[in-house]
Every structure is written in C-alpha cells, then in structure tokens.
Amino acid sequence: MCIRDSSRTPTSVAGTLFVDNWRWEGVPFRILTGKKMPYGCVEVVIKLKAPPLKLYEGEINDRIVIRLQPNPHLDIRMDIKSPGLDDNLELATLTHDYPQDRAVDGYEKLLFDAINCDQSHFVHADEVMESWRIVDDLLCTGDKCKIRTVPYIYTGGWGPQHKVDFITDWDYPA
C-alpha cells in the first residue's frame, strides 16, 4: 500500500469510547477498524462480568458474540464445570447461524425502510454531529489534541505493533 508522506487519512484505528448516559455509564465500547486487515467483519462482543464469588479456578470468559457481517450468527460462550470429580472449567458455546437465504443486504433494508417512511435505521443529526466530533479529534494535530495518533508503516496483519498490543488487552475471543 502506498500512502503519501503528507497524507493525514487514518488507515488504522483502535480505541475505547464511552457513552455519556446513565444506561451505559462505565461500559467500554471498543472499536477496531482499518484497511487491509486479515478479514472483515462487523460484530458486537458483550463480555459478561465475572460473578463476585469464584467457585472454580481459571478465567471466566462468559460472553455473547453477535456477528452482523459476514454470515450473521449469534454465539453465547460460557465456562461451565467439566463433568466429573475435578473442578475444571471448559468452554461451552451455543451457536445460532441465520439462514443465508433469508439474509438481506444492508442497502435493501435501507431502501425498503425509505420507501415505507421508516426512519428508525437512519442516522439522526445529533449522531452525525457526534461522529464528526470524534473524527475531528482523530484528525487533530498539535499540542491541543485530545487523542494521541501514532504514525506507522503498514506491514500487514492487524496493523502496527502498538495497535496489536492495545487490542490484546481487550481479551477478545478468537
């Protein structure tokens, strides 16, 4: 990939956002995006809190994974006690794959909604303004910037090493 030295177009972003309302207070929303990544997908991973009482040794990795694109599906992943006398945990996954013949292209749904005057899937003005506020912070240069950007040379994979180190801390399910 050839990018001019003068380019200020972000090609790789990893960050944590917080929603400023009572419902989502303190809940991190982690964003990972970039060009030429190993694979493209849109998914939501909800990592459930560990119970306050730890009955068994090992990590608790209970989570709900909602894949929107490609191949929409839902995974509920939880650590359960293995059968037998020991106190080992094993990962159990409940998966639901949505039939591909019922899948609808995103633009089909938007056109259908537009024809039926349903605005619920369209971005509202306040969402657009907030998106631009975040992007403007990413494009900021100088000492007054709220977000630190790091120049890097693209070498493939998930992006520069500092991005890989950053997302490793997310405990993202493979």
Predicted features by range, described:
Residues 4-174:
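Secretory/organelle targeting and membrane-embedding segments
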